[in-house]
């Protein structure tokens, strides 16, 4: 019940996700084989990755759409959208995902699934584990490499891969040249000072942060501005 699609950035992952959800919804497919429409969750790690598809690609779902946020539990819709952070458990609250039965969703679409949800030690993984009875479709633009190995261990080998090279050859993507820039933070790493707080007043865990952590675990305003 775990499936993976790998499509290069810009080749239509969101459109493919919509078509899959739409066809399952209109044909009234569900895991139990009951005479009803499926319950589907579209899960991502940033609001714009949820809000934009919900408003545009998934517009044909109309009033069947609902975004899970602010602790509100709605169970009367069919097409749900959420970011991990809204559903996950943290030191301030129990996970909102626990308020939904384990078998509530028939399909969970995990957009940009390489961003950490498949890591065994990730709090986001708890969401996928909770909804384990559902079919889980991971979507990513990241081919198998060391920092995405957990994704492939969890979802398995891709059912279908549409590579960057294919996208360029087919005329959907423009050719490119890489210009690599190394900032001082990437070269030397970064460690917070003792008792340093983030912009929200929360303590930053004392650790050595490297390139792989930036924009995933921590975001440094000075680094972001330098790159921009």
Segments from the language model and where they lie:
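Interdomain helical connector at the RecA1-RecA2 junction of SF1/SF2 helicase-like NTPases
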Residues: 149-228
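Inter-Walker segment of RecA-like/P-loop motor cores
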Residues: 57-93
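Walker A/P-loop
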Residues: 2-20
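Residues immediately C-terminal
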Residues: 49, 86, 114-115, 144-145
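SF2 helicase catalytic motif II
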Residues: 98-138
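Conserved helix-turn-beta segment of the N-terminal RecA-like "Helicase ATP-binding" lobe
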Residues: 31-36, 47-71
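Structural recognition of the conserved hydrophobic beta-strand(s) that form the central parallel beta-sheet
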Residues: 80-83, 135-140
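Conserved RecA-like ASCE P-loop NTPase motor core of nucleic-acid helicases/translocases
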Residues: 6-8, 38-46
């Amino acid at each position: 019940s775990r499936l993976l699609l790998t499509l290069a950035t810009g080749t239509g992952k969101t459109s493919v996700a919509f078509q899959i959800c739409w066809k399952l919804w209109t044909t009234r497919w569900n895991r139990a084989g009951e005479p009803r429409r499926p319950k589907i969750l579209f899960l991502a790690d940033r609001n714009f990755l949820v809000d934009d598809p919900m408003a545009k690609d998934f517009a044909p779902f109309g009033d069947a759409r609902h975004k899970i946020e602010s602790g509100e539990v709605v169970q009367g819709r069919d097409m749900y959208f959420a970011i991990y952070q809204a559903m996950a458990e943290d030191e301030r609250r129990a996970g909102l995902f626990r308020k939904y039965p384990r078998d509530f969703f028939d399909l969970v679409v995990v957009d940009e699934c390489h961003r950490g949800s498949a890591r065994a030690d990730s709090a986001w993984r708890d969401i996928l584990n909770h909804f384990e009875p559902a079919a889980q479709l991971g979507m990513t633009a990241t081919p198998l490499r060391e920092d995405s190995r957990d994704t492939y261990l969890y979802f398995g080998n891709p059912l279908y891969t549409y590579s960057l090279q294919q996208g360029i050859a087919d005329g959907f993507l423009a050719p490119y040249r890489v210009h690599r820039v190394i900032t001082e933070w990437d070269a030397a790493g970064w460690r917070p000072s003792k008792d340093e707080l983030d912009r929200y007043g929360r303590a930053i865990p004392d650790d050595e942060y490297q390139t792989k952590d930036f924009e995933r675990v921590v975001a440094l305003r000075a680094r972001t501005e330098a790159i921009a």
